[in-house]
């Protein structure tokens, strides 16, 4: 999930216009009953609302009708990342980007008709239950996901702390299983690192790009440099992305002067985020996998295209779109795909992903981290050549 960080835009003018139109229709008692002909879209909407309210044999209110209408509008885009955020959804999104939220700690996306786990965040109930990147979510608490959108699935997975949710999963080999996971408060410390033993190589893992990532990454870099770091392994495996600006900031500390990513909007407007760095700080290796997505792919793509470092692992997820969150009121919002992004070489990775410089598989039965080993071997050779 890539949240384009910008101020929430409150569309009071649109809200006032709709409310005023409804008030006029109510005051004049216009039912539009039996009227035929071609109506403008706003009139069609108001006529439908009037018909439903007047004739539906059941309990409902105007709030329910507007809620349903908004959902219908965003679902009509056919884009799984463009969604209506009700009060619960909006609060959950805010909590996640701030670093604390409730649930089981998995991030998923949509590919074709399938809802695929992008990552199970480390040390969360989802990871502890054995949920892995690439697992397909087929049902939540017995309800088939084919009948739900992404936000509805997320809502069913979230819930009160210490309650249980049951997920039906299918792995990459087509084997099915069910897991019961106890919901917990999910805290996502974004950045962690240390020096590797026996060499001058530092290691930094970024789990997710949230509001604290850029500052935490700089602190970790400074700490490791004081400890004698001469080369760096950046671990972005299982990183589902997050805030665009955070990814740009991290890339800007690693790649040389020039483009990091280009963001192209609907009207053709193009914003190029640039690095001002004179040179890369040290030899760099980046670990990626199928769970590396979104903002993590921005960093990976910039490093690969500028040859600031070398990528090790397997092909990344392939999410190359940018979402903006726009406030409807102070409790609800819409998340809309507002742009696509392109790596410094002008490539869109949407539904394609990034292929590492060196493909290194990591079998489940591996006795050690083959991808990490390949990165260490590469950096040790780089240091010997200095």
Feature-to-residue mapping (PLM):
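Hydrophobic beta-strand signal
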Residues: 138-139, 335
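Short, structured beta-strand/loop micro-motifs enriched in basic residues and often containing a Trp
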Residues: 114-121, 147
